[in-house]
């Protein structure tokens, strides 16, 4: 929106042409989203508390979590609003990738909203039935995957790129591309949701990964940089750097209120949306494997749940972990909540740096 206005003014006042630079708009998007979160956060928290939209806590979980009962939840709506408003302000609204990513984020957020609303307002502990949750998120992910596949006009847009090697890729075909894209978008969404169990645990790694994906998006959308670094050139993908900047800024603003002891939780409305956003960006810029590396924390949390359930059924009631997801295992092992969170952040920093190194190590 502001881009079109600035370019119009730039016809007469050349100084406004600076807003055509993606790097500037990415920084401005991050700052705008951060300020929106700061400005609106207290009011959102007060409204959630007044409506008694509070978190329910599992009786069989760590005892330290019992004090969290009643903490306002569904605060992820604040993140989504900040991302949407900022992207509409600073993004190029003629770019199809911006709209696909934004609509996927809003769609997954809507599913999470219904799930949270049923849990905390209608006092339904199950929320939205799992089959319906996966059905709706699957439909949204498939719609995005099909759109991206059908509108691809270059082979690189649907190939699986192998990091650490120059010009090593595998053609997936339409069916393979749609299947992989569905798995990445839906899988990342639910992985972030599983990770969101401690104060600040999910949001900071999400911000880190989003920041790294902003770099990948900028490189992929720049003909010169993509050629030099051996990254497939995806025309228009650079605009997703602006979206990622908005996500990172909104996430940091939310962390201000979500840091221990949390004043608000993001709920499914935030976790599902943010995970889907990361997955969609990774699909567009063809960095699914790198997302798997940088989001290793999300992968580990998900695998811990899967392994726990499978082993429990196969062994007749035995468990590998004290409790799943993985962060609860360490809590019950004696780690304080803040120790788990900060140590998992450190691991994510290492993984993100390793993921970024794939740009040069080819």
UniProtKB/Swiss-Prot annotation:
Q: Which GO terms describe its biological process?
A: cell division; cell wall organization; peptidoglycan biosynthetic process; regulation of cell shape
A single MF term (Gene Ontology): phospho-N-acetylmuramoyl-pentapeptide-transferase activity
Keywords, comma-separated and alphabetical: Cell cycle, Cell division, Cell inner membrane, Cell membrane, Cell shape, Cell wall biogenesis/degradation, Magnesium, Membrane, Metal-binding, Peptidoglycan synthesis, Transferase, Transmembrane, Transmembrane helix
Is Heme a UniProt keyword of this protein? no
UniProt cofactor(s): Mg(2+)
Say where the protein is mainly found: membrane
Query: What role is this protein assigned?
Result: Catalyzes the initial step of the lipid cycle reactions in the biosynthesis of the cell wall peptidoglycan: transfers peptidoglycan precursor phospho-MurNAc-pentapeptide from UDP-MurNAc-pentapeptide onto the lipid carrier undecaprenyl phosphate, yielding undecaprenyl-pyrophosphoryl-MurNAc-pentapeptide, known as lipid I.
PANTHER family, A to Z:
PHOSPHO-N-ACETYLMURAMOYL-PENTAPEPTIDE-TRANSFERASE, PHOSPHO-N-ACETYLMURAMOYL-PENTAPEPTIDE-TRANSFERASE HOMOLOG
Q: Which CDD domains match?
A: GT_MraY (cd06852)
The record, for Pfam families, names: Glycos_transf_4, MraY_sig1
Enumerate the catalysed reactions. UDP-N-acetyl-alpha-D-muramoyl-L-alanyl-gamma-D-glutamyl-meso-2,6-diaminopimeloyl-D-alanyl-D-alanine + di-trans,octa-cis-undecaprenyl phosphate = di-trans,octa-cis-undecaprenyl diphospho-N-acetyl-alpha-D-muramoyl-L-alanyl-D-glutamyl-meso-2,6-diaminopimeloyl-D-alanyl-D-alanine + UMP
Its annotated pathway?
Cell wall biogenesis; peptidoglycan biosynthesis
UniProt record similarity statement: Belongs to the glycosyltransferase 4 family. MraY subfamily.
A GO cellular component entry from the record = plasma membrane
The residue ranges crossing the membrane are 27-47, 73-93, 97-117, 132-152, 160-180, 200-220, 237-257, 264-284, 289-309, 339-359
Q: Where in the cell is it found?
A: Cell inner membrane
- Name of the protein in its database record: Phospho-N-acetylmuramoyl-pentapeptide-transferase
Q: Which domain of life is it from?
A: Bacteria
Q: State the membrane topology.
A: Multi-pass membrane protein
Q: What EC number(s) has UniProt assigned to this enzyme?
A: 2.7.8.13
| Biological classification of the source | Bacteria, Pseudomonadati, Pseudomonadota, Betaproteobacteria, Rhodocyclales
Q: What class of enzyme is it?
A: transferase
């Amino acid at each position: 929106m502001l881009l079109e206005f600035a370019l119009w003014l730039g016809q007469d006042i050349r100084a406004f042409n600076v807003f055509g630079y993606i790097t500037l708009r990415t920084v401005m998007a991050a700052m705008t989203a951060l300020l929106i979160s700061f400005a609106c956060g207290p009011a959102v928290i007060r409204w959630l508390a007044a409506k008694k939209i509070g978190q329910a806590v599992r009786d069989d979980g760590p005892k330290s979590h019992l004090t969290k009962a009643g903490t306002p939840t569904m605060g992820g709506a604040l993140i989504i609003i900040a991302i949407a408003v900022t992207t509409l302000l600073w993004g190029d609204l003629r770019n199809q990738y911006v709209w696909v990513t934004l609509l996927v984020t809003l769609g997954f957020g809507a599913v999470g909203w219904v799930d949270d609303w049923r849990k905390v307002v209608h006092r339904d502990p199950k929320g939205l039935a799992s089959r319906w949750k996966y059905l709706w998120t699957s439909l949204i992910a498939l719609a995005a995957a099909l759109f991206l596949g059908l509108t691809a006009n270059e082979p690189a847009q649907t190939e699986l790129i192998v990091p650490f090697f120059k010009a090593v890729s595998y053609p997936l075909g339409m069916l393979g591309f749609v299947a992989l894209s569905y798995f990445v978008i839906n899988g990342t969404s639910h992985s972030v949701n599983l990770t969101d169990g401690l104060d600040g645990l999910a949001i900071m790694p999400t911000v880190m990964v989003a920041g790294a994906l902003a770099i990948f998006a900028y490189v992929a959308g720049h003909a010169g940089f993509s050629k030099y670094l051996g990254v497939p050139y995806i025309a228009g993908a650079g605009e997703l750097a602006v979206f990622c900047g908005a996500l990172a800024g909104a996430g940091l603003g939310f962390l201000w209120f979500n840091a221990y002891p949390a004043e608000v939780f993001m709920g499914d409305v935030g976790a599902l949306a943010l995970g889907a956003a990361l997955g969609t960006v990774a699909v567009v810029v063809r960095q699914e494997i790198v997302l798997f590396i940088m989001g290793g924390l999300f992968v580990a949390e998900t695998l811990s749940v899967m392994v726990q359930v499978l082993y429990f059924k196969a062994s007749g009631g035995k468990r590998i972990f004290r409790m799943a997801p993985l962060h609860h295992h360490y809590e019950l092992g004696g780690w304080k909540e803040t120790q788990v969170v900060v140590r998992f952040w450190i691991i994510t920093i290492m993984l993100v740096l390793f993921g970024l190194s794939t740009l040069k190590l080819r």
